[in-house]
């Protein structure tokens, strides 16, 4: 997943070849200090290649697999409003453990949706990964700023 080339722009510093975790963390620090735009190709490349993790290909490891909708009703409401759509894409911000009160697990399991689970807390993120969700995951937070912050 190492980019084969760097992204160059006359007004921007290019990303150096990323070889390991320290390299991409260093590159992220550089982009953070520059307060690059959220759609900067260098930032997008680092996030895609080094932060977002692929969906699990292992069986689910849920605490309560018999509970189809752990969202306490929100997902059922959305499912109805979306006319029980199959094959959609979701973004869940604040995935917690990937199961408890999840608004997206029902879409993933019953409607064949894919998506992105975002969880900022490293401890909870480890729990998300243990659930073997069939969605992309990222251990990151959202920001009110239009540039990356640490």
Segments predicted by a language model, with ranges:
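Phosphate/nucleotide-binding beta-alpha loop and adjacent structural elements of enzyme active sites
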Residues: 1-150
